[in-house]
C-alpha cells in the first residue's frame, strides 16, 4: 500500500483533503452566483445547484473540490434531464457560509446577495 507523502499529512498523520485553490473558490462561487438557489425547505437552509446532465463533469469537479454537498440525479422532468447538487447542514454552515460571507457583496451581484441575505435571515445564520 502506498504511503501518503509528508506534504499531504495533517498533524494526526491522516491524509488530508486537498484544499481548494483561489481559482477553485472563485470559479465555484461564480457558478453559485449564476446558477444557484439560496433558500431552504422550511426547516433548514440549503443551497441548490440544478443544471442539465451535459454538465455532469462540472458536478464531479465540484464534488472533488468541495466534498460535503450531495449530488442527486440524473432526473428527467418535463423533457429536461438534470442533476441537482445540494449543500445543507454542517457543510453549508462551516464551509460555504464563510466563503460566501467573505466574498459575496451587493456590488458584485445585488440579486444574489439579496437571496443569500434572505436565506441567512430566515434561518438565522
PLM feature spans:
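Internal intein/HINT superfamily modules and their associated LAGLIDADG
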Residues: 1-125
